[in-house]
Regions:
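Active-site acidic/histidine proton-transfer and metal-coordination neighborhood
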Residues: 65, 80-194
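Acidic-and-aromatic substrate-binding clefts and catalytic sites of carbohydrate-active enzymes
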Residues: 16-21, 39-54, 74-80, 124, ...
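Conserved, mostly hydrophobic/aromatic
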Residues: 7, 32, 40, 59, ...
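Acidic/histidine-rich catalytic cores of soluble enzymes
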Residues: 39-40, 142-253, 258
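Boundary/entry segment of secreted carbohydrate-active catalytic domains
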Residues: 1-23
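Hydrophobic faces of well-ordered beta-strands that scaffold small-molecule active sites
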Residues: 3-9, 40-42, 66-70, 112-116, ...
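Acidic (Asp/Glu)-rich catalytic clusters
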Residues: 1-2, 29-34, 49-68, 89-111, ...
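Short, flexible, mixed-charge acidic loops at enzyme active sites
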Residues: 19-23, 123-130, 231-244
Length: 307
């Protein structure tokens, strides 16, 4: 088992580049390195500089490599497709200008990856974690989303050689078990893989261990996070947006929550997964003073159980 443990700017509350409380990007890189990570995601489009001449020296200074960039946007609306493709070209151009990640032995596709996440729908945002009441897309709108995902993935791969991976996410139109199964049926593995996230699987009512086992044949990239069960129970009983729940502390350092990480370690070994795992812990950026301690604690816990 060859694993490269990475982190992401969301651990510092970076999910919306327009949030006025975001920490400086240089601080995020510095603290990621201090916590023992050697890989980091770009975060939302435009948080880290899109100019490789600025970003590459900062990465070199902190001994970090970029493991992924992310499309975190409305994948459903046809009118948004030009923006999705603009971001795809921008992210992939930057990724190709940065030093490449070393491919791990046994890894299916070398990083960096392009992570694709649907987001930006109020009705689904307020229904995060509630499969019973979350409105589903009709056939035409689902087909449009699949077409847009294919377009993004094909540009990433055929133009830049970057593997696209689809990330089911709380509050988006790919969240619950039925949507994940439908996605896998509609998007073949040669077009895009999966980035499964233990925290989002649990939030959506799925068992992370069982889900990773079920979709191991499609799994190219992993996200690890943990959930505070007390806060989770509270927010599920409120009318609340997903990131408002994160601001309440629903995500916690790995090993302090409800997810069974020793079981996940055993499963990762059993499956022979090789490659990258990115640690995440969404929060309000106004609480980023605790980020260094939290990401360091998550890294130490994972190392202690064998990752």
């Amino acid at each position: 088992m060859t694993i490269h443990i990475c982190t992401a700017p969301c651990c510092w509350g970076v999910d919306d580049v327009n949030n006025p409380f975001l920490p400086p990007w240089q601080r995020v890189l510095d603290e990621a390195a201090k916590a023992g990570y050697r890989g980091i995601e770009l975060g939302p489009y435009g948080f880290l500089p899109l100019d490789a001449g600025i970003l590459e020296p900062a990465l070199s200074k902190t001994d970090l490599q970029v493991v992924a960039g992310t499309i975190f946007d409305d994948l459903v609306s046809p009118a948004n497709l030009p923006e999705l493709l603009r971001q795809t070209h921008g992210i992939c151009t930057l990724l190709k200008q940065l030093p490449p990640m070393k491919q791990q032995a046994g890894q299916r596709f070398a990083g960096p990856y392009l992570v694709i996440i649907d987001w930006g729908h109020d009705a689904r945002d307020y229904a995060a974690g509630h499969s019973d009441r979350a409105p589903r897309l009709d056939g035409a709108r689902w087909s449009a989303m699949m077409t847009h995902i294919r377009a993004i993935a094909e540009v990433a791969w055929h133009t830049y050689g970057i593997r696209a991976v689809i990330h089911p996410h709380a509050g988006g139109h790919i969240e619950f078990a039925d949507e994940l199964a439908r996605l896998v049926d509609d998007i073949p593995h040669e077009v895009a893989g999966l980035c499964l996230d233990t925290g989002h699987l649990y939030y959506a009512g799925m068992d992370p261990v069982a889900s990773l086992r079920t979709y191991a044949h499609r799994l190219d990239y992993l996200h690890f996070k943990d959930i505070d069960p007390t806060v989770f129970d509270q927010v599920l009983n409120e009318h609340i947006r997903f990131f408002a729940a994160c601001a309440r502390g629903v995500m916690c350092p790995i090993g302090r929550g409800v997810i069974d990480y020793p079981a996940l370690h055993s499963l990762v070994q059993e499956l022979g997964y090789h490659g990258c795992i990115t640690v995440e812990q969404e929060r309000d950026p106004r609480d980023a003073a605790a980020s260094l301690d939290d990401v360091a604690a998550s890294r130490a816990y994972l190392a202690n159980i064998g990752f």
